[in-house]
Amino acid sequence: MSDIALSISILALVAVLGLWIGNWRICGVGLGIGGVLFGGIFVGHFTDSWGVALDSHTLHFIQEFGLILFVYTIGIQVGPGFFASLRSSGLKLNAFAALVVLLGCIVAIGLYKIFDVPLPVILGIFSGAVTNTPSLGAGQQILTELGAQEGMLDLTGMGYAVAYPFGICGILLTMWILRLAFRVNVDKEAEEFEVQNGHKKQNLHTLNVAIRNPNLNGLQLKDVPALAEGDIVCSRLKRGEKLHVPRPDTRIETNDLLHLVGAKHALEKARLVIGEVVDASLSTRGTDLRVQRLVVTNEIVLGKKISHLDLKEKYDVVVSRLNRAGVELVPTSQTTLQFGDILNLVGRQEAIESVSGIVGNAHQKLQQVQMLPVFVGIGLGVLLGSIPFYLPGFPAAIKLGLAGGPLLVALILARIGSIGKLYWFMPPSANLALREIGIVLFLAVVGLKSGGGFVDTLVNGDGLSWMGYGIVITLVPLLTVGFLARIVGQLNYLTICGMLAGSMTDPPALAFANGLHPTSGASALSYATVYPLVMCLRILSPQILALLLWAV
C-alpha cells in the first residue's frame, strides 16, 4: 500500500472511531464532533508505537483544507445575520460575549507569565478550554508563520486535547452555578422573556381593518401615514362585496376593508389611524384572487429591488410577505431579492403564473449546490488570509490566515447574496455536510499528530497541570461575565445561558441551555446573536496572543 493510500485509510479509521466516541452520552452530554480528536489521539498513539509512517504532506494538506471548508461554510451559514447582530439590539449581548473572549486572553497571558508555560502549549490550552477548533487552527498557523518547529505544533494539539473535556463541562457547570446563586425559576424567566420581547418576535401578523377615519376618504393608499412607513403591506382591499389587489395609487373610501400584514406593534399603530378591527372575511376563497408562495431562483432578478419588477403595475400582484432563511420580513419597494427568498403573492391565477416565470420558482434549484461560487469564495478567502498586515511593535505580520480569510470572505459574500449570475446560497443540508467533512478531516489529523506523545505527557509529564490551566481559562471568564450580565446587565437567565454558549461557540452547551426550557427560544436567539462576532474573535485572538508573546 502506498503512503498516501495508507494515510487516507488511517484517517478513515480515525473518523469512524471518533464519530462513534462522539455519540457517547454521559448525563446527556457528549463530545459530539470533538470525539474525532480523541479518536485521532487513540489511533495516533498506536501508529507511533508500532512505527507506522504516514505521509506528512498529505496529512498537512488534508488538515488545512478541512479547516478552510469548515470556516467557509460557517461564514456562509451565519453571514446573512452577522451584520444584523451588530445593530443596537444585540450590542449588549455582543459586548458581554466579547468580554468572555477578552478575559480568556488575559487569563491565558497570566498563566503564561506566572507558570512559564510554553507558548504552543498555552495556545492549545486556550483553544481547548473554549472548545473552539478554528482557534486551534489559527494558533497553529501563526506559529508556523513565526517559524515554530513541527514538534511545537504537536504540543499545541496536545494542549487542546487535554483542556477540551472540561471546556465542555465547564460551561454547563457555570449555568448550574448561576441558577443556584440567583435562585432562578426557569419557567418564570421564560415567561418574562416572552412578555419583554413579545413585540420583537419576527413572525408577521394579519389584521382586517375597516376605514372609519373620515380624513382618509379619497386618499391614495401610499399617502396613508400608517401605511407609508414601510412596516405594513396592504395585500387586499374589499369594497362592498368586491375583493381587489390594491396598488399604491388606489384611492380608498370610508368603510373599505383592508387586509394588513406586518408586525404586531405596527398593526396596532395602523389601526389607531385607520379605524377599527372587523371580523369580516377577506379570504380569496370563492373569488378570482389567489394566494401563492413562489421561490426566487431566477438569476435575472437576483439583486433587484421589488419595485423594479413592477408587479403591481404590470400584473396587479402584491407581495404580502417575504421569508428569508426562515425569517419573515415585511417586503417594501426597496427590498432586494436574494436567491432562495420565498414570496407570498396575492393576485389572479394567470397573473401569478406570469410572475412565477419571472422569479423562477424552480424548487429543484434549492437542492443544488452551485460549486463555482464555492471555489471563488474559498480562493478569495485564501488570498485575503495571505495578505500580511504589519503593526508596529509586533515581531511578525498579522494575517487572517486560512481560518480567518475564508471566514471573512464568506460572511461578506453571504451578506451580498449574489453578484451577477453567481449566488452564494447553499442548501442547509449541503452546508452541514461540507462543514462536518471539513471539521472531521481537521480534527482527525490534529489527533493523529498529537497522539504519539499524548499519553506520556498526561501520565509522566505536565498533562495534569495543563488540565488545571484549562479549567481556569474556562471558568474565570464564564463566571465573571455570567454574574456581571445578571447583576449589572439585568439579563434574563435563559438569555445569559445562550450568550455564554455562543461565547464558547459550543453547540452541546446550546443544546443543554435549550433543554432548560424547551418551549422558549431565548437561549437560541442570544446564541445566534453573538455567534458570528465571537467566531471571528476566537480565530483572531490566538494569533494576537502568539504575536504578543512570541518575542517576550
From Swiss-Prot:
Membrane-spanning segments: 4-24, 26-46, 65-85, 95-115, 158-178, 371-391, 394-414, 439-459, 464-484, 493-513, 532-552
Chain coiled-coil ranges: none
Protein's membrane topology: Multi-pass membrane protein
GO cellular component: plasma membrane
Source organism superkingdom: Bacteria
GO biological process: potassium ion transport
Subcellular location: Cell membrane
Keyword annotations from UniProtKB, A to Z: Cell membrane, Membrane, Repeat, Transmembrane, Transmembrane helix, Transport
NCBIfam families: PRK03818.1, YidE_YbjL_dupl
Protein name per Swiss-Prot or TrEMBL: Putative transport protein PBPRA2144
